[in-house]
Swiss-Prot record:
Annotated binding of ATP, by residue: 7-14
Gene: tmk
GO MF entries: ATP binding; dTMP kinase activity
Pfam families: Thymidylate_kin
BP term (GO), one: dTDP biosynthetic process
Organism: Campylobacter curvus (strain 525.92)
EC number(s) stated in the UniProt entry for this protein: 2.7.4.9
Full protein name: Thymidylate kinase
């Protein structure tokens, strides 16, 4: 089962992925961007801030990573529980936040192409208030190029993520990121039962 953990930075995705992975020893933990060797290089380019890419070039690099990630990580491990920190929802949402002229349907088609039509089996979406995001990001210290765009930008991305999830009949568990870790974990465990 291919499960995406989606939400902006600082909402608790990584914490929950670690907990779920410990409870499911045969699970595969991966991430986008950066889940493959080429993905790690693309991640450096995309998040490092060394290059000023156009919005469309950025989308295409994320799609290249997504296609490679699907071929090397998701497809060959389809019989396992795959826990991915981000995926196509983030890709589409960040693209929409960067360029309002883009259409969700076009971006979903491009992602479907990259994923051979295989979107995630289940999606866990973490939503957080402005106050919570600000608090958690300020406690982390280092900021990547996307986080550096600001809190308002991350809130815009979060709204775009919700639009993406509503645009298609995805199997989604909505999580209030302000809930305690154990409560969130129990909800996710129940959601991903085989």
């Amino acid at each position: 089962m291919y499960v995406l953990f989606e939400g902006v930075d600082g909402v608790g995705k990584s914490t929950q992925i670690e907990m779920i992975a410990r409870a499911h020893e045969d699970s595969l933990v991966t991430k986008e961007p950066g889940g493959t060797k080429i993905g790690q290089k693309l991640r450096e380019i995309l998040l490092g801030g060394d290059f000023k890419l156009s919005a469309r070039a950025e989308i295409l690099l994320f799609l290249a990573d997504r296609a490679e990630h699907y071929q090397k990580m998701i497809k060959p491990n389809s019989s396992r529980l795959i826990l991915s920190d981000r995926g196509f929802v983030s890709g589409v949402a960040y693209a929409l936040a960067n360029d309002a002229s883009l259409k969700i349907d076009d971006l979903l088609w491009l992602n479907s192409f990259a994923l051979e039509g295989k979107f995630a089996d289940k999606i866990v979406f973490f939503e957080a208030s402005e106050t919570l995001i600000k608090k958690r990001l300020s406690s982390r210290g280092l900021i990547d190029a996307i986080e550096a765009r600001g809190l308002k930008y991350l809130l815009k991305v979060q709204e775009c993520m919700k639009e993406v999830l509503k645009a298609h009949k995805f199997n989604v568990l909505y999580i209030d990121a302000s809930e305690d870790i154990a409560t969130i974990n129990a909800k996710i465990e129940n959601f991903i039962k085989f």
